[in-house]
Regions:
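Primarily the internal scaffold of c-type cytochrome electron-transfer domains
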Residues: 1-179
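Extended alpha-helical scaffolding segments
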Residues: 181-183
């Protein structure tokens, strides 16, 4: 669990969210935070791995709380589960019943990609009584468009996994694009 793994279909979804037990460093390498130079110890105590502070205060070390820790951003009641940055941007998966891990790619929730690509999204992790189409419509209503994230490679990975002829050139484009996460 502490060795990096390649983004293979057995371990990661096509959008590179964690699918199986992997070292979270792999998802971290995909994040905009990593690209900006943020390190593990900016959020975690290097000796205990515990968060340096609690709740949204971790994210507010860099992000403007008046803009992001607000109902106008997260669309949830203040203090509720959906109002926690990590619930939307670092969804948790529990492995073997006792090992909860958050995906550290810190992605923008993309329920539209759940609809088109079949990947999970943070909205439906909590709103289990609704489907991805509902979540995608809710995000579209809030933003006036589909959400856009830092990780844009999912449709290309899906095409590659599906054996589409255009996938090779598109994969080469991702591999040569310095703006893409290096992993």
């Amino acid at each position: 669990h502490y060795l990096p793994s390649l983004l293979t279909p057995a371990l990661y979804h096509v959008d590179a969210q964690q699918q199986d037990e992997v070292f979270i460093w792999g998802s971290w390498l995909q994040s905009r935070m990593h690209a900006a130079g943020v390190t593990c110890s900016d959020c975690h105590d290097p000796h205990t791995q515990k968060l340096r502070t609690s709740g949204n205060a971790v994210c507010a070390q860099c992000h403007d709380a008046s803009k992001y820790d607000a109902g106008t951003h997260h669309r949830h009641q203040q203090g509720a589960a959906g109002a926690q940055c990590a619930d939307c941007h670092m969804p948790r998966t529990t492995y073997m019943v006792v090992d909860p891990r958050r995906d550290h790619s810190m992605r923008v929730p993309r329920p539209d990609e759940s609809v088109s690509l079949g990947v999970p999204n943070a909205c439906n992790a909590c709103h289990t009584d609704r489907d991805a189409k509902w979540a995608a419509a809710a995000v579209r209503d809030w933003l006036g468009r589909d959400a856009v994230g830092y990780q844009t490679f999912a449709p290309v990975f899906q095409a590659a996994e599906g054996g589409e002829p255009s996938a090779l050139d598109r994969l080469a484009g991702i591999a040569s694009d310095a703006a893409q996460p290096a992993i």
